[in-house]
Amino acid sequence: QGFYKVQRHLGRAAHVAYLGTLAVAPQAKGSGLARRMMQDALDRLAASGIRRVELSVEADNPRAIAFYQRFGFVHEGTQRAAYKRAGEDGYVDELMYGLLLEA
């Protein structure tokens, strides 16, 4: 009903992970599954020594932005005109968010 994908950085940024995807099936929306998955991901990352989690979200996705902010993610920058959606004329801004985990 859902999955998440995390990529851990290497070298001097080995304390950082990028949360690339967190997705739930349409029928699971509103069930709390995404919240449980996010908490599971953050707990596992913290237990493995990760101290910083990064993610990006489309600027026109207020539901996802609010979701990430509820977990304490902070807006750290905007990548303007980051990409173009298929079949659309305009470009999409990508918002960069970060979260520092407890040591």
Please give the residue ranges for each predicted region.
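Acetyl-CoA-dependent GNAT
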Residues: 1-27, 38-40, 44, 100-103
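Conserved GNAT acetyl-CoA-binding A-motif
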Residues: 45-56
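Terminal substrate-recognition subdomain of acyl/acetyltransferases
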Residues: 87-103
